[in-house]
Amino acid sequence: MKIKVKLFARLRELAGTNTIEINTPENTTIAELIETLQTEYPKLAAAAANTIVSLNKDFAELQTHLHEGDEVALFPPVSGGSGSAGSDEKFAITYDPISLDDMAAKVVKPKTGAVAVFGGVVRNISGGKDVDFLEYEAYEAMAVAKLKQVAAEAREKWPKIVDIAITQRIGQLDIGENAVIVAVSSPHRGDGCFEACAYAINRLKEIVPIWKKETGPDGSEWIEGDYMPSTTDAQ
């Protein structure tokens, strides 16, 4: 059976390609598929301990059996945060500049009395090293779905929320540019808009497949998170 494998960020660079189509026997598991890939692309083994797996755009266990036409993605822990095709108005991955005012306007409704907005901005230093610019990469189809999941989780925790919008910018971003914006509205400031906004950006950094590469005078480096999602983070 034919399986499509997509690779992102450091794993894409280690393999030297972003997509691999591979023929495997029936009932092959994800773990067995990865073993085959590491044989054909030995450099991938160096990142095995920090590799996250998704199956058909959601998190999956290594012992899951694959089927004809499945899409497996391999990527490192996400580092997103600080409309393209497939994005909708309130949950978007985009190459275009993003605005705090525009995002706030998306969540203002007649019963809105409070809006909390978080903006992640590209800074010129990270970990004590100078930074010239950042490059963001995303597994776009899965990322939009996970942005919606983050919003749904926030609504469940703070049911008085009126609306929520999240947009992540990808591509090359210069110092001072907005990388990610979260906007949350509620009837009153005490109805959860602050808490939901903070929850959303923190959760984005855990489960939304977005990565960043920092470039400065000392060269370029992929920045990886430390949260390892599991099937409990699946929708």
Residue ranges and their predicted role:
Residues 4, 8, 71-77, 83-180, ...:
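N-terminal, polar/charged subdomain of small-to-medium soluble alpha/beta proteins
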Residues 1-86:
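Ubiquitin-like/PB1-type beta-grasp interaction modules and other compact soluble beta-rich domains
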